[in-house]
Amino acid sequence: MIPGEIITPDGEIELNAGRNTVKLSVANAGDRPIQVGSHFHFYEVNHGLIFDRELALGMRLDIPAGTAVRFEPGDEKEVTLVPLVGSREVYGFNGRVNGEINAEGRGG
């Protein structure tokens, strides 16, 4: 074994298996590209992105950690979101929640 080595079982690993997901159509109405990282609270992304924000409360992109989705000006694409897990407390980002998100997705 090499220090830091991760040994995984054979086969494919399914990310976020069994978690509820939401699909949203997202459009970039701005004049510059907008990139959103894998663990950014999607509800709080740049307001140049147009979508149903209430559905995104407490959610993040369903993509591998460390990756991102880029929206070019005028782009519209469908994204899949998964719930934030753990304590379901959201602090920072754009400061729109700064607290707990309850089971219904509403700020606490």
UniProtKB/Swiss-Prot annotation:
CDD domains: Urease_beta (cd00407)
UniProt xrefs under SUPFAM superfamilies: Urease, beta-subunit
Cellular compartment(s): Cytoplasm
Entry's Gene Ontology BP terms: urea catabolic process
InterPro entries registered for this protein in UniProt: Urease_beta-like (IPR002019), Urease_betasu_sf (IPR036461), Urease_subunit (IPR050069)
TM region positions: none
Highest taxon above the source species: Bacteria
Pathway where this protein functions: Nitrogen metabolism; urea degradation; CO(2) and NH(3) from urea (urease route): step 1/1
MF-aspect GO terms: urease activity
EC assignment: 3.5.1.5
Catalyzed reactions: urea + 2 H2O + H(+) = hydrogencarbonate + 2 NH4(+)
One cellular component term from this protein's GO annotations in UniProt: urease complex
Main location class: cytoplasm
Record keywords, A-Z: Cytoplasm, Hydrolase
Similarity annotation: Belongs to the urease beta subunit family.
Listed NCBIfam families: PRK13203.1, urease_beta
PANTHER family the UniProt entry points to: UREASE
Subunit structure: Heterotrimer of UreA (gamma), UreB (beta) and UreC (alpha) subunits. Three heterotrimers associate to form the active enzyme.
UniProt-recorded name of the protein: Urease subunit beta
Organism whose genome encodes this protein: Trichormus variabilis (strain ATCC 29413 / PCC 7937) (Anabaena variabilis)
Higher taxonomy: Bacteria, Bacillati, Cyanobacteriota, Cyanophyceae, Nostocales
